[in-house]
């Protein structure tokens, strides 16, 4: 599962987190480590659609459309991980993102008794890294509250969707 992020930064420049995740997913696919890529992200607005953008870039990298499955309700990491299990039937999963994000995703997966491993995309350095560290600190606190205090699940579940051949 490839976790979503914006294709561009607020200043309009390409987001290195996004493109490094695409490269990581493509590397896993072309090395034969994964056969399908579940792209999970936010698409609350027509003009902002993380799964569509990830699919487009993965196809540009040479990955066939038939090997890309889109999850349009991955509004946050909790949604993406739980939907991977409950909607897409994945109990064993490789999660692709940067290390800081993967640590949170793996925590959620283990909370839901999933067999999950992480593949870490390259982390950009500099000011972006510092901003992300602050955001991640807050996201982890929210995750703990969501899981252990509020016991929140995903915003949407839905009809089960099978990945791969039937």
Please give the residue ranges for each predicted region.
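A transmembrane-helix-recognition feature enriched in membrane-embedded lipid enzymes
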Residues: 133-156
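A structural signal for short, hydrophobic/glycine-enriched beta-strand patches
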Residues: 1-134
């Amino acid at each position: 599962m490839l976790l979503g992020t914006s294709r561009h930064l607020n200043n309009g420049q390409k987001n290195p987190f996004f493109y490094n995740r695409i490269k990581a997913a493509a590397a896993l696919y072309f090395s034969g480590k994964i056969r399908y890529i579940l792209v999970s992200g936010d698409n609350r607005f027509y003009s902002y659609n993380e799964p569509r953008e990830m699919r487009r870039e993965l196809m540009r990298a040479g990955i066939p459309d038939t090997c890309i499955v889109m999850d349009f309700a991955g509004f946050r990491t909790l949604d993406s991980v739980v939907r991977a299990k409950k909607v897409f039937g994945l109990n064993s999963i490789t999660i692709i993102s940067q290390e800081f994000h993967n640590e949170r995703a793996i925590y959620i997966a283990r909370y839901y008794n999933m067999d999950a491993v992480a593949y870490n995309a390259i982390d950009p350095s500099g000011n972006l890294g510092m901003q992300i560290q602050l955001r991640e600190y807050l996201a982890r606190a929210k995750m703990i509250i969501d899981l252990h205090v509020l016991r929140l699940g995903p915003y949407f579940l839905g009809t089960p969707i099978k990945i791969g051949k039937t």
